[in-house]
Swiss-Prot record:
Glycans are attached at residues 55, 247. The modification Phosphothreonine is found at residue 406. This is Discoidin, CUB and LCCL domain-containing protein 1. Pfam families: CUB, LCCL. GO terms for cellular component: membrane. Its main location: membrane. Disulfide bonds join 32-59, 85-103, 149-165, 169-191. It is a single-pass type I membrane protein. It comes from Mus musculus.
Length: 503
């Protein structure tokens, strides 16, 4: 039993020895959390912040600012479970003054302005169940607009304001939503968003200038400068960072100009549409056709090439063609060329293709086939037939003297022989006699125009006078009853090709 009684006594002895060691470890242990300090500002938290601080811990830290300046302390968060500040508290002390202790039951000021440039921060904890501890920021008296790392855009209602962020706010727990272009949701942490936007650095902190405006439906998130921005939903307000020289007028001018240009464009469009429908009596016809916009000559317009295309109006071209056709139809068509001569003027098919009578009288050797004297009161051209027979002209046939005997008297044609002694004057319509056996004379037109049979008009054999009788030849010449005179001497007979073309 001694052994049994000695066992509990040994355990009690061990507990008595270890308890002071445990208490000494908690008391001497580092109970400080996140600490970032710079020349003018810094941030300090309890251990595990914003989680529960540990039991029986001590955190002691001396902070200073340049000499000649005073310290400004701001408590962003203080959550200590103790109500009497006996074992858990926060205390600030300087060479001349002491501030605290502060705990859950005591009123804690948000800001402390000290009369010195140095202060000692002491945080102690005992046995507790919950509590976040504290978050402290500080800065020199040069930055009276100091804010903590937990300040959000929704905490301020001014449209434009400026604040000073201390060093060390990047790793403080808290979310931001948005980006530099669209702005940040008003629930975002100001100093953390400023680091995300690149306005300040986490090691030094700095001043930020903010502009509060109407919120948007969605905020895009991204990672920048070691800070992750999350996607955000619709919010009533948002804030944007501006440069120090930028004011509200500078930000509002682009929006106002855009709205003014939009309204001006809509007004001009409405006026142009109204003028196009109703018309403007004070504007020229060209302006009404093209609207109210004037033609603008561009300085870099391409010059017109030297090549060009001539276009014709189809209607004008058709009108000219019809005029030409009408004028051509008014004249007589060009007859076929007979013999070796060239036709120099237009005439009817029934008109002799010789020169004027004036020229025939002057030169009897001029080119031409026939000399037809005109009687007064008669038309120069052949008249249409008065009966219903087919209107065909009597073919004119010239043959060589050697073929004269091939035509019979029944065919309606008679080939006269040469008359070496008979002469005719130009006034009587005659021609000089043939000089050789090869020269031929033409055929006389029958006195009666009535054809013997159907088909072509053929002169009857009995209607011809004997061409060898000078008396009958003289009588025919003086009569001039629309007959053809004999051809001039010296004309070559028609060849076989010309005869085929005539027929």
């Amino acid at each position: 039993m001694g052994t049994g009684a000695g066992g509990p006594s040994v355990l009690a002895l061990l507990f008595a020895v270890c308890a002071p060691l445990r208490l000494q470890a908690e008391e001497l242990g580092d109970g400080c959390g996140h600490i970032v300090t710079s020349q003018d500002s810094g941030t300090m938290t309890s251990k595990n912040y914003p989680g529960t601080y540990p039991n029986y811990t001590v955190c002691e830290k001396i902070i200073t600012v340049p000499k000649g300046k005073r310290l400004i302390l701001r408590l962003g968060d203080l959550n200590i479970e103790s109500k009497t500040c006996a074992s858990d508290y926060l205390l600030f002390s300087s060479a001349t003054d002491q501030y605290g202790p502060y705990c859950g039951s005591w009123a804690v000021p948000k800001e402390l302005r000290l009369n010195s440039n140095e202060v000692t921060v002491l945080f102690k904890s005992g046995s507790h169940i919950s509590g976040r501890g504290f978050l402290l920021t500080y800065a020199s008296s040069d930055h009276p607009d100091l804010i903590t790392c937990l300040e959000r855009g929704s905490h301020y209602f001014e449209e434009k304001y400026s604040k000073f962020c201390p060093a060390g706010c990047r790793d403080i727990a808290g979310d931001i939503s948005g980006n530099t272009k669209d702005g940040y949701r008003d629930t975002s942490l100001l100093c953390k968003a400023a680091i995300h936007a690149g306005i300040i650095t986490d090691e030094l902190g700095g001043h930020i200038n903010l502009l509060q405006s109407k919120g948007i439906s969605h905020y895009e998130g991204l990672l920048a400068n070691g800070v992750l921005s999350r996607h955000g939903s619709l919010s009533e307000k948002r804030f944007l960072f501006t440069t120090p020289g930028m004011n509200i007028t500078t930000v509002a001018i682009p929006s106002v100009i855009f709205i003014a240009l939009l309204l001006t464009g809509m007004g001009i469009f409405a006026i142009c549409r109204k003028r196009k429908k109703k018309g403007n009596p004070y504007v020229s016809a060209d302006a009404q056709k093209t609207g109210c916009w004037k033609q603008i000559k561009y300085p870099f317009a391409r010059h017109q090439s030297t090549e060009f295309t001539i276009s014709y109006d189809n209607e004008k071209e058709m009108t000219q063609k019809l005029d030409l056709i009408t004028s051509d139809m008014a004249d007589y068509q060009q007859p076929l060329m007979i013999g070796t001569g060239t036709v120099a003027r237009k005439g009817s098919t029934f008109r002799p293709m010789d020169t004027d009578t004036e020229e025939v009288r002057v030169n009897t050797e001029a080119s031409g086939h026939y000399d037809c004297p005109h009687r007064p009161g008669r038309h120069e051209y052949a008249l249409p037939l008065t009966h219903s027979e087919p209107e065909y002209a009597t073919p004119i046939v010239e043959r060589h003297l050697l073929r004269a005997h091939t035509f019979s008297t029944q065919s309606g044609y008679r080939v006269p022989g040469p008359r070496p002694t008979h002469k005719h004057s130009h006034s009587s319509g005659g021609f000089p006699p043939a000089t050789g056996a090869t020269q031929v004379e033409s055929y006389q037109r029958p006195a009666s125009p009535k054809p013997v049979g159907g088909g072509y008009d053929k002169p009857a054999a009995s209607s011809f006078l004997d061409s060898r009788d000078p008396a009958s030849q003289s009588q025919m010449t003086s009569g001039g009853d629309d007959g053809y005179s004999a051809p001039r001497n010296g004309l070559a007979p028609l060849n076989q090709t010309a005869m085929t073309a005539l027929l």
